[in-house]
């Protein structure tokens, strides 16, 4: 059953927590940075897996870790990006959800907390990702706590401007010179 939640995923009572990651070993922003600070052993295992090129889109890296506030947890590192500089892709979410479903069933995970996969720093549309999660996981025997983006994050996503990168600036100059 899917439960829709707002708040801090790291405070969840769920048996497993999903951490959105890239495949290069960097947890520098967003929820990944929070996981890095809260679960240092998970970060060490994840970084080592990335250094060995074992972290791939569609594969979950599951680590048992604990801290003083949450106790023992299964941390499910879910790759939503190949590199921290690049955006997420819907195909990455789809592949990951298939793998996540298998892990939940194989490990008999009774409850899991999931953030808005690839929808903040990854740039994906939350409503589309939410629908993908519902289609993939709603029929399994597990309490799924789906943490929706806060209203402030949704508003920021709507109004966030496209950044002017050097490549975009060159393209604009090229069009300006054509006139």
Language-model region placement:
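Macrodomain-like recognition of ADP-ribose-binding/processing modules
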Residues: 1-179
């Amino acid at each position: 059953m899917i439960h829709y939640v707002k708040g801090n995923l790291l405070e969840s009572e769920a048996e497993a927590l999903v951490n959105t990651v890239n495949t290069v070993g960097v947890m520098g922003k967003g929820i990944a940075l929070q996981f890095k600070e809260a679960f240092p052993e998970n970060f060490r295992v994840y970084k080592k897996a990335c250094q060995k090129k074992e972290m791939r889109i569609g594969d979950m890296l599951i680590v048992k870790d604990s801290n003083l506030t949450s106790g023992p947890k299964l941390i499910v590192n879910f790759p939503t990006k190949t590199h921290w500089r690049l955006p997420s892709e819907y195909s990455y979410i789809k592949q990951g959800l298939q793998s996540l479903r298998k892990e939940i069933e194989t490990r008999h995970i009774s409850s899991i907390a999931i953030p808005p996969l690839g929808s903040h720093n990854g740039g994906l549309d939350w409503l589309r990702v939410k629908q993908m999660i519902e289609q993939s996981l709603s029929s399994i025997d597990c309490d799924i706590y789906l943490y929706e983006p806060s209203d402030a994050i949704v508003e920021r996503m709507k109004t966030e401007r496209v950044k002017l990168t050097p490549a975009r600036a060159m393209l604009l100059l090229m069009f300006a010179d054509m006139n």
